Amino acid sequence: AISTELGFDDLVSFDVNSDCELEYMIFGKLRLMISEDNFKDIIGENKDEFYYLKDTKNNTYQLRIDAHNHSQIYDEKTLDLTNHIEKLEKTAIDNLSLDLRLYNTTQTREIMKYIDSKVNKKQVYKLPEDMKTYTANFKKGLYKK
């Protein structure tokens, strides 16, 4: 998969005739960090499905502990590039992906209705108000000002 740190201008520079299939995530929570600190000291025996880290600005970041006892920390906002699918189709990207692994069944159904409405150009189904979305670096790229 191609990093979502790359903006659209970066994506159009890829060779369309490449033998390598290119994948780009258009919806989901971005993993920000993997840490070898598994936070067991803090969590203890509490076996909740999700844990959160909170920063000094009150942003909350979802934390999951993987099978190797590494902590995976995810962005609090949800990447949503569904408004840019037609632009992405004009690049060398072969596959667009959705990452819904951090959502429960009810949330996944809501997200799928939303995406279906966008892809099929129906009246747009709204996501729940508490689901904050953003386009990450799609418009400007990571290192551009």
Where are these regions (language model features)?
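Active-site pocket-lining/capping segments in soluble small-molecule metabolic enzymes
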Residues: 1-145
